[in-house]
């Protein structure tokens, strides 16, 4: 696998879970974009306030640097807007975006049951409002089990 894989989607779509499992199957390193948010961004989201494009600038720059430094990897990153995906794609590194497409109610249920995460359920509406569905991504229906999704991706990528 020569391409870096960016697992994208709204909060609760399964990016971290799928990313970890897929990285393990493909023997690649996994990174979670959530780990690269500044303390200010985490605090803002924890308070139920959505991030702005300006809030995301340094975060996206850090992820773009990571993509260049650690290639190939599996990266979980919301990448909700086209311009965020373009920012991550600025280098000559081959990227493949995998969009975990999930119905609102399924994502809401997952977020409500999630513990120890800074993203409150109240921000899910803003995630869906911000989402610009990717045109050139592998589109996966994410309400399936994690193992079924990873099997599907492994078959697709091989």
What is the predicted function of each stretch?
Residues 113-152:
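Small-molecule kinase domains that catalyze NTP-dependent phosphoryl transfer to phosphate-bearing small molecules
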Residues 20, 24-62:
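Conserved substrate/cofactor phosphate-moiety recognition/catalytic segment
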Residues 10:
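P-loop (Walker A) phosphate-binding loop of NTP-binding proteins
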Residues 4:
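Walker A (P-loop) ATP-phosphate-binding motif of ABC ATPase nucleotide-binding domains
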Residues 15:
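Conserved lysine of the Walker
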Residues 92-110:
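Conserved phosphate-donor/acceptor-positioning beta-strand/loop module used by diverse small-molecule
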Residues 70-73:
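Loop/turn-to-beta-strand initiation segments
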């Amino acid at each position: 696998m020569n391409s870096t894989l960016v697992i994208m989607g709204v909060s609760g779509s399964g990016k971290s879970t799928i990313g970890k499992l897929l990285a393990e199957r493909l023997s690649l390193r996994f990174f979670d974009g959530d780990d690269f948010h500044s303390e200010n961004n985490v605090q803002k989201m924890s308070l139920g306030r959505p991030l702005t494009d300006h809030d995301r600038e340094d975060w996206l720059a850090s992820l773009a640097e990571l993509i260049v430094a650690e290639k190939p990897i599996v990266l979980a990153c919301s990448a909700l807007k086209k311009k965020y995906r373009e920012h991550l794609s600025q280098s000559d590194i081959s990227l493949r975006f995998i969009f975990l497409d999930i119905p609102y109610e399924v994502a809401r249920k997952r977020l409500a049951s999630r513990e120890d995460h800074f993203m409150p359920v109240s921000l899910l509406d803003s995630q869906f409002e911000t989402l610009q569905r990717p045109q050139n991504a592998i589109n996966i229906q994410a309400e399936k089990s994690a193992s079924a999704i990873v099997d599907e991706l492994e078959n697709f990528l091989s």
